[in-house]
A protein has these predicted regions:
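Active-site histidine-anchored catalytic micro-motif
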Residues: 1-139
Length: 139
């Protein structure tokens, strides 16, 4: 297995950050050594972010953030109370959007559907820098 930790600047706002091109580059560099087949695994080593596979660019990313705001309002109901008001919701996020995903790679290509993208979902406005671990598991 080969693994690489990448840094992602998410800024001080809620974001759905598309990682697909970064993942494609990583897979291209690794897949040639394994006859092109294997598994890409992503992991976010943070308690307040997750990985989602969804359509982007057609408003689905904005819709996801809106749904998360409805499900997890940024208010004072949360027992976890450090950081900005409502920050406790960010610690619940990984229970809904897990901090990991695995995507099969066949013939050196991610087997995503036509409209699928691999995204980092980050609602924590207190932490503008994130990391994502990409791991290549050859077949």
């Amino acid at each position: 297995m080969r693994s690489e930790l990448i840094d992602v600047g998410t800024g001080s706002r809620e974001v759905v950050f598309d990682l697909t091109s970064i993942c494609e580059q990583f897979v291209t560099a690794e897949a040639h050594q394994a006859q092109g087949d294997g598994l890409l695994h992503l992991f976010v080593p943070h308690a307040t972010a997750g990985i989602a596979i969804l359509e982007t660019g057609a408003g689905s990313d904005t819709d996801l953030l809106a749904v998360l705001e409805e499900l997890l309002p940024r208010d004072f109901r949360w027992q976890h109370r450090h950081g900005t008001p409502g920050h406790g919701r960010d610690h619940v996020l990984p229970a809904l959007i897990p901090p990991h995903a695995s995507i099969p790679v066949i013939g050196g290509r991610l087997t995503l559907g036509t409209w699928q993208s691999i995204c980092l979902v980050d609602t924590n406005v207190d932490n503008p820098q994130r990391q994502v671990r990409l791991s290549w598991l050859p077949s």
